[in-house]
Amino acid sequence: MSDLDYYQVLGVSRTASQEEIKRAYRKLVLKYHPDHNPGDKNAEQKIKNINEAYDILKDEKKRSAYDQLGHQAFKNSGGGNYQQHHGFTGGIDPNDIFENIFGDFMGARRSSKTAFSKKAGANLKYDISLTLEEAFYGVTKIISFKTALTCDACAGKGSLDNNSTSSCPTCRGSGVTRSQQGFFFFENTCQTCRGAGHVIKNPCTKCYGEGRYINTRNLEVKIPAGVKEGSRIKLTGEGEAGSRGGKTGDLYVCITLIPHNTFSVDGNDLHCQLDINCTTAALGGEVEVADITGSKLKLKIPAGTQNNHKLKLSGKGMQILHSDRCGNMIVHVNIKVPKSLTKSQRELMIKLDKELNEASEEGFLSKVRNFWASGSE
């Protein structure tokens, strides 16, 4: 291990955040990457120093030990040189810059053994919120998202010429390198070619040999009538672009419904609340209700309707997906009792209450008489 000042190597302060350290590392790796500096021994040494510094500073425990003890914290841990083999070492991959840009876009890391081969793009997920009316009628939305797009400069090949690859100079085509730490020997995936055994000879200057680059994409999405909460629409070939001609992934648009002021959804049925007064509940009648389209509908209230009774309007619910049919509209009746009465209303209610109680008592006495009459026979 060298006696470098790791903070100076990365060009950051000792109080730098992990994000600042990572950003500085990415910038330096791009600048001194061997693809951009072929045969430059100075650039090769700088990359080694950059990787060594990043390996320590990206790890909070190693960084803390370094801050307290400097290089002495690591000199007794392995008994050997920190780096003794060719190429990029110390467990840090200079191609991590591409991992961070592309591989982590959907949380999927790229395999080191296919780093310089065709690789399919990741499937993407996009969450979209719709009003209930939009879900009922269907709607076209323009969505905007960042993703990996096929590089137009190299047509996705990653190379500026047809003879795109050559044998890796670091591992000589084997895909592995060997290192020694103390008495132990280790065989590692070559970090120049990432195990492929070959490298891009003349990489594209726009995508750095990746065959794709990050940019914002605008896409028109047609959402059919009748989608529900949690519905998922698959758009084949609209996901992340593959690397170096790999297959493009798919895009999944996931639906969330914004709560409605009037209706709630249960399957294909729409539920709503209706307040009626106690006289309408007792006598029955006809009221107007509005459906999801705003149309006024006549609803009959049967005489003697009880609180929380449900009334159904057939075919007035949600549009059924990929169909010309609709679910039902379920109306929940809430009987409202007046909080205050006029003198005449109060007198009428007292009279009604008396008559109802008398009818109830008469019915009870009639049942008793019938019981004794049947028992005496």
UniProtKB/Swiss-Prot annotation:
One GO CC annotation: cytoplasm
Gene Ontology biological process: chaperone cofactor-dependent protein refolding; DNA replication; protein refolding; response to heat
Location of the protein in the cell: Cytoplasm
Zinc finger (CR-type): 138-216
Keywords: Chaperone, Cytoplasm, DNA replication, Metal-binding, Repeat, Stress response, Zinc, Zinc-finger
Residues given in the record as Zn(2+) 2 binding sites: 168, 171, 190, 193
Entry's family note: Belongs to the DnaJ family.
The keyword Cytoplasm belongs to this UniProt entry's keyword annotation: yes
Name the record gives this protein: Chaperone protein DnaJ
Positions of CXXCXGXG motif repeats: 151-158, 168-175, 190-197, 204-211
Quaternary structure annotation from Swiss-Prot or TrEMBL: Homodimer.
Chain positions recorded as Zn(2+) 1 binding sites: 151, 154, 204, 207
Keyword Metal-binding: yes
Cofactor section: Zn(2+)
MF (Gene Ontology): ATP binding; heat shock protein binding; unfolded protein binding; zinc ion binding
Role: Participates actively in the response to hyperosmotic and heat shock by preventing the aggregation of stress-denatured proteins and by disaggregating proteins, also in an autonomous, DnaK-independent fashion. Unfolded proteins bind initially to DnaJ; upon interaction with the DnaJ-bound protein, DnaK hydrolyzes its bound ATP, resulting in the formation of a stable complex. GrpE releases ADP from DnaK; ATP binding to DnaK triggers the release of the substrate protein, thus completing the reaction cycle.
Protein encoded by which gene: dnaJ
InterPro entries, alphabetized: DnaJ, DnaJ_C, DnaJ_domain, HSP40/DnaJ_pept-bd, HSP_DnaJ_Cys-rich_dom, HSP_DnaJ_Cys-rich_dom_sf, J_dom_sf
Domain of life: Bacteria
Co-factor note (free text): Binds 2 Zn(2+) ions per monomer.
Residue ranges constituting the J domain according to the UniProt record: 5-70
SUPFAM superfamilies referenced in this protein's UniProt entry, alphabetically: Chaperone J-domain, DnaJ/Hsp40 cysteine-rich domain, HSP40/DnaJ peptide-binding domain
Main location: cytoplasm
Domain comment (free text): The J domain is necessary and sufficient to stimulate DnaK ATPase activity. Zinc center 1 plays an important role in the autonomous, DnaK-independent chaperone activity of DnaJ. Zinc center 2 is essential for interaction with DnaK and for DnaJ activity.
